[in-house]
Amino acid sequence: VNILDEELARYPAAVGIAIADTQACEVQFDLAAESDIPVVAFDSGSDYQGLMAMVSTDNRTAAREAAQRLAESVGEKGEIMLFIHDSKSESAMSREQAFREELEANYPEIIIAEVYYMDRLSDMQERIAAEMNGESVGEGGETPDADGIAKEEGDNGEPAGGNGTQSEEAGNGEPQAQAAQDAGGTEVLADGEAILADTISEEEVIDYLFEKHPDIKGIYATNGDAVKRALETLERNEAQASIIGFDADEEELDALRDGRVDALVLQNPFGMGYAAVIASARAALSMGNEAVVDTGYVWLTKESLEDEEIQKLLY
């Protein structure tokens, strides 16, 4: 927001922006409109009505196809885990929502066991600390965190992975000094001392979620960072699962080549940037723009990696 404020203070001819938070910047966009500065969104947009154009991948279509491909990889049944790069951007929300909708409509035997939002570590720390410490769960068996976020539920309405371990009292009424264990066998309570949320690392958070569900067969990751986080998790836990994700940096390509990633949504970053500049220039000149410019995507697999058309899109 501060960067946008600085740029608007220079009164540019137009602004092109990838909106990281759908609820942010509306005041700035209003100020831009008052100053006759057109705003074009690219990669990730918002519902703001004053945008001159939205230039991006069709995230919903790509996510639905990702669900189909992951379903095929896991045999159309079983548990999967989602790694979502954030909980606020339009691109992340669209990729998650459309993926869920496709599974619900066509693959009822696939259960989303856990979802890890990469921008909500503190929430996850609170939830997991509560589970580790054996705190009481909410109505319906859900364990809420500080913001009331509940665990993923299976299709039977029960929380995926069960509840935290409750400490028992000795016969004399005094609490026993005992250790609780998480799904992976890690000691989480010792001598009656509670685990503090902020002492749990991100790796421990993810591993805890993963260890609760040892039968996870697939992972859906919504951008390059999420794919890498999924790969790191599988490596730490010496586990295997099908991975379907977005983007294609060098680490992802290496994982694709050696079979650790099944397939990737390859976007068109050059085309997206080019189209955003053209749309911004047209808006500055009061020329018409398409409301939505779809820059397309292709599926990248180990077999298609060396195709000439694929190589043109890699960055």
Language-model features, listed with the residues they occupy:
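A residue-level marker of the well-folded mature domains of exported/periplasmic proteins
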Residues: 1-315
